[in-house]
Amino acid sequence: MMRSHADDSAEARPAPAMSVGVFIPIGNNGWLLSENAPQYRPSFALNKAITLKAEGYGLDFALSMIKLRGFGGKTEFWDHNLESFTLMAGLAAVTTRIRLFATAATLCLPPAIVARMAATIDSISDGRFGLNLVTGWQKPEYDQMGLWPGDAHFANRYDYLAEYAQILRDLWETGASDRKGAYFQMNDCRLSPRPQAPVKIICAGQSGAGLAFTAQYADYNFCLGKGLNTPTAFAPVVEKLAEASARTGRRVTAFALFMIIADETDDAAMATWAHYRAGADAEAIAWLGAQGAADTRSGSDTNVRQLADPASAVNLNMGTLVGSYASVAAMLDAVMTIDGVEGVLLVFDDFLKGLDAFGTRIQPLMRSRRHVTAAALPEVA
């Protein structure tokens, strides 16, 4: 078995409890730009099955992204996408425990409308709803609708998002906003009913500006895991988040995004990973690279720069954990050795099979999930 980055002596210490979420495939083919990976279109039926399975295995939350234009290529990567809020509203009606996060494309949706949609899904879910805020980095998504504000947005996008988040908080917490800024002007805007539970905000900032925004306005930060079987390589981003949070006096914890490719043995899992890499969709990857290069205003530390790095663009350069079920369990436990990390957000090469493997083969081996496996879980469909 491949050893994790956790020290062997950690076996004797209680492991911090890990929260686990699933990044459901709202777009076709999930997160693999490969002709050799499973090919499928998104549907409510698929995402319902995934989310119910995740709930049955005791996962803590499900998150859907928003993507309004794909990358093309032979696999038509992300050319076929559902819409995040309406999908999560449907899932809210058929689940009972798992928390649900939708993603707001803030260049398309006014904050007062998002506040009301969130309050509605809060009602459907009985307080289980949260919100992921994104600034919008891929110009063709918005330019096709005449909504791109100009390339200056690359530099001022977090100023825009700060006003947006302030209006959301005004409406959710007080039911009214009269806030007037550079981007939005509220005129005694009202919201009722308000959410019954606090709506948690998450952000995926990795740059200095993104982390500063998260520390001021969000409750959680999603970090991209890094590398192949290097579960703690993203730790410097968490350290920067802690520094930013110290300046605001707020507690903001991190979740790391990882792709899981697991099998009975390390060699079998690595063979699958090699097969996916061999089928990389070069045309779609080239589109991703071109869009990432379009932002000449931001620094080199943005999420987009990592996503578009040619090194492993076949899965958007997210952290990838490949190995036997035991190896993957150990590597996931290692994530929780980083101070300030609350958990992980997982994607799978095949979501239904992958969740079954996680729930029955990986999670039972994880010290950081003993609070789940020690409890009796409902039967999984």
UniProtKB/Swiss-Prot annotation:
UniProt-recorded Gene Ontology molecular function terms: alkanesulfonate monooxygenase activity; uracil oxygenase activity
Enzyme nomenclature, EC number: 1.14.99.46
One Gene Ontology term from the biological process aspect of the record: uracil catabolic process
InterPro entries reported for this sequence: Luciferase-like_dom, Luciferase-like_sf, Pyrimidine_monooxygenase_RutA, SsuD_RutA_monooxygenase
Keywords, in A-Z order: Flavoprotein, FMN, Monooxygenase, NADP, Oxidoreductase
UniProt KW NADP keyword: yes
Origin superkingdom: Bacteria
Residues at which FMN binds: I66, K67, N132, E141, R157, Y158, S207
SUPFAM superfamilies named in the record: Bacterial luciferase-like (SSF51679)
Catalyzed reactions per annotation: uracil + FMNH2 + NADH + O2 = (Z)-3-ureidoacrylate + FMN + NAD(+) + H2O + H(+); thymine + FMNH2 + NADH + O2 = (Z)-2-methylureidoacrylate + FMN + NAD(+) + H2O + H(+)
Family assignment from sequence similarity: Belongs to the NtaA/SnaA/DszA monooxygenase family. RutA subfamily.
Function: The FMN-N(5)-oxide reacts spontaneously with NADH to produce FMN. Requires the flavin reductase RutF to regenerate FMN in vivo.
Protein name (database record): Pyrimidine monooxygenase RutA
